[in-house]
């Protein structure tokens, strides 16, 4: 929506394209794009964790965090979400359920916290997980959407909201499967 303040944080290059324009090219929404700036000098190093801390002071409606790859990003993005901000991010995983475990194991690399506590943090921070996959025909599909409810006794409690199911594969005249 045009009345939402969006702030994106990305590493290296800008991939999010969230600016909306009208037919005359006027910008309709409020988007601030931030990029990390790695430096060997710690005083000059600007990483995602550093930017996340500062973004919270700007009162965003939505924070877009580029691909989650490190322990600091994993926990700081989750903590930002737990402050009431909507945080959208991407991460490589094999399924909706494994996404929570992947975020937890990333955080575990740096933070000596109990697995169940980290998993509860991730489920609270990211109640909705969307899993996409590239299929054999090279199309990318949303395979599943789940709503994480809780993590108890070493078990994720989640509800499937959507599941893509392939009912039939068809081979066309060129031998391509669709």
Where are these regions (language model features)?
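Switch/coupling sub-region of P-loop NTPases
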Residues: 2-123, 133-134
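Conserved P-loop NTPase
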Residues: 123-178
């Amino acid at each position: 929506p045009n009345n939402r303040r969006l702030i994106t944080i990305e590493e290296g290059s800008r991939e999010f394209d969230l600016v909306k324009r009208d037919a005359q090219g006027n910008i309709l929404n409020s988007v601030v794009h931030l990029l990390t700036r790695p430096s060997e000098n710690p005083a000059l190093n600007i990483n995602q964790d550093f930017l996340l801390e500062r973004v919270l002071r700007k009162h965003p409606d939505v924070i877009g965090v580029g691909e989650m790859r490190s322990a600091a990003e994993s926990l700081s993005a989750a903590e930002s979400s737990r402050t009431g901000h909507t945080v959208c991010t991407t991460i490589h995983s094999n399924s909706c359920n494994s996404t929570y475990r992947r975020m937890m194991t990333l955080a575990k690399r740096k933070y000596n916290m109990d697995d169940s506590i980290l998993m509860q943090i991730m489920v609270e921070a990211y109640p909705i997980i969307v899993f996409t996959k590239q299929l054999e025909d090279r199309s990318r599909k949303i395979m599943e959407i789940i709503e994480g409810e809780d993590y108890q006794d070493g078990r994720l409690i989640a509800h499937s909201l959507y599941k893509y199911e392939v009912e039939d594969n068809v081979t066309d005249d060129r031998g391509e499967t669709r």
